């Protein structure tokens, strides 16, 4: 039942695609909770939806606790996706998400900076390079190349001052609360899977690299890289447990020539970028082709450049359903028989 781990990976891409991790211009680590995914059967479709909650009031200077810069950062996010097996080796996915809120609460809860709206549209084709079963052990290797296109706003503003003489004065909100980073990004992905059928144990790993582009404000968020190592096992037929150790790296934000990130957008470049390690348990309930799951991300190690809000609480839950769009065909010498 490999598909119990196939869907959290996409919400990981969608939310972490805008993560930068700086005190004035990042999203902490909302991507956390990645899971591996290979390909579907030919003519098989998968639909899934997930809800994700993120909260953090932890702040770090490098790897040390430090004083809070604001009260907390939190978000509520829903993510939906469709996959289709074009051939037995090639699967195409499309996904998008919506933030009900991304909020930065100031100290003493005196003020709130927040936004909501659509995040990114993700196109994610994957190709199975190797897939064989021998002695009840199945081995699979998959590569993917994806594209992330922003749908929501990356330049929402906040009212700073209102005066009868000069009117309203607005400032662009920090990237921590923007629904998207506003750039077109490329994604490079690999997946290795080994299934020990008799023991109902699965070992697998994935690697992801996101190459950022520049947005319309002249900002280029740091590239993102991660690698995950997984162990999964099915219990009592319908219950599955998967554990993951994930390491991630986020590069520093950059700007086009002539753009002053501090003066224009209050972003301190020295406080962007991070290295983190997470432990991610996941539990799933399987009913035929329908799966319900819940997962959480537990930070084990965090090192941030400068001073930033860190990762603290991230919980994801959702469902996944697979079905055949067309009945499989049995080929004979003279004609094809469609199985109903």
Regions found by a protein language model. Give the residues of each.
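Surface-exposed strand-loop-strand hairpins of Gram-negative outer-membrane beta-barrel proteins
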Residues: 52-77
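Outer-membrane pore/translocation modules
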Residues: 111-206, 213, 266, 270, ...
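Short loop/turn motifs that connect adjacent beta-strands in outer-membrane beta-barrel proteins
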Residues: 20-23, 36-44, 89, 131-140, ...
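Outer membrane beta-barrel transmembrane domains
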Residues: 58-60, 66, 217-340
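Transmembrane beta-barrel strands of outer-membrane/channel proteins
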Residues: 47-55, 94-98, 143-149, 205-209, ...
